[in-house]
Amino acid sequence: MRAIIFDLDDTLYDNKDLRIAREKAILDFLGNKKWKYKELKENYSTLESLKRLGFEKSHFFRLMDKIPITLEKDPRLIKMFKKLKERFKMIVLSNVSAFCVEETLRRLGILEMVNEYYSGEDFKNQKPAKECFCIVKRGDICVGNNFKKDLEVPKQKGAITILVGEEEQNADFRIDNIYELESVLKYIELPDFQ
């Protein structure tokens, strides 16, 4: 069975308040190092920036686990996932902790429809490291909001890439939001999708 591999944050949901709360927690935690962090963030991911400041990813996970995940069930997402699960193996791949991944999926109402999920705790390095995409096979579909982090390696492996939100010439398809996914799948030549 072919898989759809989803990024989580800013792909399956968009919640500005949660994003702001997480960033505030990081800045408060860093204290006087926050200015260097902001400078590093211009070129590196959150985790890489923290690593360059001498913090382990476990610090980040513990910090994020304390932020309340203020999401509600998403009926449109639930309906879409139920339909897609009939034809695809549903996988979520995220850089956040296992707790945050599971809690987010539960709150959105799609945890039971996800066959597998992988968190930042499952790999030595974070996306976009190649090791994080060991589950991606040629012909799988990968959906994410950041081409470099979520889709570049899968595309190199022969996956079909769908970018959510951003403009990017290298993705196979682009959608404005996750709810447009089904309309794109109709144009992908997949023998198992009608």
Regions found by a protein language model. Give the residues of each.
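A general structural-boundary detector
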Residues: Y13, Y37, M64, F88, ...
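Alpha-helix C-terminal capping segments
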Residues: R19-I20, K24-G31, Y37-L40, K51, ...
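N-terminal helical cap/lid subdomain that shapes the substrate entry/recognition surface
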Residues: R2-K79, S97-F99
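Hydrophobic residues in well-ordered beta-strands that form the structural core
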Residues: D14, V92-S94, L163
